[in-house]
Swiss-Prot record:
Major localization class: cytoplasm
Binding site for L-aspartate: 177, 223, 461, 506
Entry annotated with the keyword Cytoplasm: yes
Region described as Aspartate: 201-204
Site (Important for tRNA non-discrimination): 30
Gene3D superfamilies: Bira Bifunctional Protein, Domain 2 (3.30.930.10), GAD-like domain (3.30.1360.30), Nucleic acid-binding proteins (2.40.50.140)
A GO molecular-function descriptor: nucleic acid binding
E.C. number: 6.1.1.23
PROSITE patterns: AA_TRNA_LIGASE_II
Alphabetically ordered keywords of this record: Aminoacyl-tRNA synthetase, ATP-binding, Cytoplasm, Ligase, Nucleotide-binding, Protein biosynthesis
Name the record gives this protein: Aspartate--tRNA(Asp/Asn) ligase
Cellular component aspect of the GO annotation: cytoplasm
Gene this protein is translated from: aspS
Organism: Prochlorococcus marinus (strain MIT 9211)
One BP annotation, GO: aspartyl-tRNA aminoacylation
Length: 606
């Protein structure tokens, strides 16, 4: 149907006869000559329709609506000097049409303009409802091409490193760890259910037992969890697993992979190796295991300095086993007023969202004099004040913000305030930090969290992470005692405060795997029921192995400089996990439910 793509024509095609297909981006009538911007997936070409070419041709051109699908036959020629568009790669040429055929008209009115010349912002709801139209827009086309290029770059890199791509099952069994599963009833096996995979975790480990050694997959994953801007109920991972590699070898290989992607897609040289921070250091310095290191305001523990100053908020927190920590805001005296820190202010509100009751503060004035609330100023002696200023490295003009209480809440509070102020003070939107890619590995995570409500241990990542051998010792008799305090051989890759992915070395000893499952409350009988096939495999010569997975949607979001992963996915769901275009999820017929031996108990109370 066509001889060339619109965006591929150049000066060397002048005087060539071509046949093009695409959508009418816009039509313009200039003094009796009609100009059509014809758009296809490659770009735009100007079509000129001259009345001298025939009345029928001209009448068709006059009747065209935007987004009509047409076929054009004509000759490529140079544009007149005054018509050259240097902004377009095809801007020096045009096609003089001698045949114009409408392949499919537009019926009715379009819900929004698609033209490359129309950049009017649209509500996301209408974009998602008519996604097939939204995909024609330059923004989405660019994002999907970038996504494709990212995947191809990763594939090429991994295949050069000896990896092979293997698909793992989509219909699998439900297991007790992780988020809620999406369940699929089996018609053939009455009363039984499949689960959609939250990750290919167990299957990729079984591939290592099977001797594959280096596996990767662009894997579809499914999690029934609460959503936000960078989460979807179905998402894509760049998933990997490797045998006979140490943690450091895995980190180094993936640093090179990330550097390769950023060089190919963004043209940026990323310095490797990436910094490594232990989980504990990350929490101590930033209050989070996903730190943004493009700016300062690191946390400082001042508990030992302020414990005896007579301020009950501080002393009470420390006596209860908590802590007092602070961040220093350089030149904060000018940029942050007291009103913003006190109840009702925006800085106060950010702290409150994290669970804090409020923030204390000190303003450093000339000659290191301080302004603060009376309860602190009246009880802080010169030695304590000097120690505080020395430890925080505060100078005149700086503002010190304090959080006190349970250390976990203190960390969440100062992390949230730190991120909020970085945006408010434009620390990450101007200058060097605007185009700064601060990658780092967070390592040495705790193996377990302790769930205070349920009074039991939970795996911080998942129950297949290998513990640090130094932490558990070589004697299996000590595993039960040492495991809860052990560090995992786990690692997360963080970029500018966002987790790009993570992984770990895996347990390849069946006894240790059983003990880890017992530690999180999965008894031996239940472990055999839920994970028996994995435990059996580990008994049959499982190699040392490890891996990781990157969130592909999130990587593409960052590379494309979008704010939401929904703008990097062809057909995403909303934050209510709905597809507005296909109207999914939807009710199904009673006949379908009967075939699956399912009865609905849901009652519409509206």
């Amino acid at each position: 149907m066509r001889s060339n793509y619109c965006g591929a024509l150049r000066n060397e095609h002048i005087n060539s006869k071509v046949q093009l297909c695409g959508w009418v981006d816009r039509c313009r009538d200039h003094g009796g000559v009609i100009f059509i911007d014809l758009r296809d997936s490659s770009g735009t070409m100007q079509i000129t329709v001259d009345p001298d070419q025939g009345t029928d041709l001209f009448n068709i051109a006059e009747s065209l609506k935007n987004e009509t699908v047409i076929q054009v036959t004509g000759k490529v020629r140079s544009r007149p000097e005054e018509s050259i568009n240097k902004k377009l790669e095809t801007g020096q040429i045009e096609v003089l049409a001698d045949v114009l055929k409408v392949l499919n008209p537009v019926y009715g009115n379009l819900p929004f303009a698609v033209s490359v010349h129309d950049d009017e912002p649209l509500k996301e709801e209408i974009r998602l409802k008519h996604r097939y139209l939204d995909l024609r827009r330059e923004r989405m086309k660019k994002n999907l091409h970038l996504r494709h290029a990212t995947i191809q770059t990763a594939r090429n890199f991994l295949e050069e490193e000896g990896f092979i791509e293997v698909e793992t099952p989509i219909l699998t069994r439900s297991t007790p760890e992780g988020a809620r599963d999406y369940l699929v009833p089996s018609r053939v096996c009455e009363g039984e259910w499949f689960a959609l995979p939250q990750s290919p975790q167990i299957f990729k480990q079984l591939l290592m037992v099977g001797g594959i050694e280096r596996y990767y997959q662009v894997a579809r994953c499914f999690r029934d969890e609460d959503l936000r801007s960078d989460r979807q109920p179905e998402f894509t991972q760049l998933d990997m697993e490797m045998s006979f590699m140490s943690q450091e070898e895995i980190l180094c290989l993936n640093e090179r992979l990330i550097a390769c992607i950023w060089k190919k897609i963004k043209g940026k040289d990323i310095k490797v190796p990436f910094p490594r921070l232990s989980w504990q250091e990350s929490m101590d310095r930033y209050g989070t295991d996903r730190p943004d290191t493009r700016y300062g305001m690191e946390l400082v523990d001042v508990s030992s300095i302020v414990k005896d100053i007579g301020f009950k908020v501080f002393s009470g927190a420390i006596q209860a086993g908590g802590s007092v920590k602070c961040i220093k805001v350089e030149e904060g005296n000018q940029s942050i007023s007291n009103v913003r820190i006190k109840p009702g202010g925006d800085v106060f509100n950010e702290a409150q969202k994290a669970g804090a009751k409020g923030l204390a503060f000190i303003r450093v004035r000339v000659n290191n004099e301080i302004d603060t609330i009376g309860a602190i100023k009246d009880n802080l002696n010169n030695q304590q004040k000097n120690e505080l200023l020395l430890k925080t490295k505060a100078k005149p003009g700086d503002l010190i913000l304090f959080a006190a209480g349970d250390t976990e809440i203190v960390h969440k509070t100062l992390d949230k305030v730190r991120q909020f102020l970085a945006k408010e003070l434009r620390l990450i939107s101007t200058g060097k930090s605007k185009d700064q890619w601060n990658f780092l590995w967070v390592i040495d995570f705790p193996m377990f969290n302790f769930n205070k409500d349920e009074k039991r241990h939970e795996a911080m990542h998942h129950p297949f992470c290998a513990p640090n051998a130094k932490d558990i010792g070589g004697d299996p008799g000590l595993w039960e005692e040492n495991l809860p305090k052990a560090r995992a051989q786990a690692y997360d890759l963080v970029l500018n405060g966002l987790e790009l992915g993570g992984g770990s070395l895996r347990i390849h000893n069946p006894e240790l795997q059983q003990k880890v499952l017992e530690t999180i409350g999965i008894a031996k009988d239940e472990a055999t029921e839920q994970f028996g096939f994995l435990l059996n495999a580990l008994e049959m010569g499982a190699p040392p192995h490890g891996g990781l997975a990157f969130g592909l949607d999130r990587i593409v979001m960052l590379l494309s400089e979008e704010d939401s992963i929904r703008d990097t996915i062809a057909f995403p769901k909303t934050q209510q996990a709905r597809c507005l275009m296909a109207q999914a999820p939807n009710e199904v017929s009673k006949r379908q439910l009967k075939e699956l031996h399912i009865a609905s108990t849901w009652v519409d109370n509206e």
